[in-house]
Amino acid sequence: EQVLLTGDTVLGRGTTVVAYPDGDLTAYLESLERLQRLTRSGRAASIAPGHGPVVPDAAGTVEHYLRHRAERLEQVRAAVLELEQEPEPVGGLRRDLADRVVERVYADVPREVWPAARLSVLAQLDYLGRLG
């Protein structure tokens, strides 16, 4: 059987947090695209991640990761556009953009994970900023 060792790129459960400033979303997406080529070619059937159980459906899991990242990026992009339309608060400092994006995009996620979500949002904002 063709097993792909993915380390932390693809996990046995959940998804990887690409945390700014060390995590580079461009490099991460490029890695996922390379994994996608390997799984689509049939050279890898299952995944042995650095954490969690073996993943029997390598191709489906990599597709899920890519789709999840695309969805999150679109959610972050939409949140930024919405936030740009909001007026400046009267008499107060405007909160950090990343915090405000987290409140919108990760509203359904327990607040305990918001610090990690914030680092992920910072990586996504950096990525979107480089795209222009």
Q: What does each model-identified segment do?
A:
Residues 1-79:
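Metallo-beta-lactamase
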